Amino acid sequence: SITIFKKINSLYVNIFILESMINNINDFKKHNNTDKREKNLNLILDSNSYKLAQEDLNLLRSDEMRGVRMLLEITKPELVLEEQNIISTIIVFGGAKIVEESSAQSKIDEVKNLLEKCPQSIKLKNKFNKLKNLLSMSHYYESAREFSKLASINNQDDKCNSHVIATGGGPGIMEAANRGAFEADCKSIGLNIQLPNEQFPNSFITPGLCFKFNYFALRKIHFVMRSVAAIFFPGGF
């Protein structure tokens, strides 16, 4: 009977050990399955498919969404200009390299000093001649600046913004036109274009009225949508 008791006791011990092993295996499987589910959920949340369409930059930049991007580009400036109560504009075009007289003269003096040290330099001679030509055109910078100042003062007030100066937002004549409005404490618009080598916006545009475009055609549309006049200075294309 003692032997039978020992065998029964041993059997119970083995059953207990087996149950413990099974429970451990089940716990491991459960824990492992939880980890896999958590990883899978993170992958779901991080995937592009789970992003809101308007937050998915890869989607918005795709060829298939070109129409949507064009609609956004035509709509955004229009909403801003309406909000700012811009009734009409005057477009000012001209060369990006034309600068004010003092700046042109300073560059000439700099090259002249270099030429005195290297009088045979063809490169410096060509640069000197180009700068002399720019100096002869510097009066156009002042003309654009003065015109924009007068046009802005006579047509803008707290309630109405008509004949607002609009440029490409770059340097040269564009800068001069924006500068004239700036010096008159009036609004002016800059319509920049995104290109690899395109200029940085000049610092005289009214904050909130400088727009960056990707499409040339839509930029041109916004140039003419509110325009009542266009002023063309030398240079540019």
What would you call each of these model-derived segments?
Residues 236-237:
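Short Gly/Pro-enriched loop/turn and capping motifs at secondary-structure junctions
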Residues 16-19:
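Family-specific functional microsites
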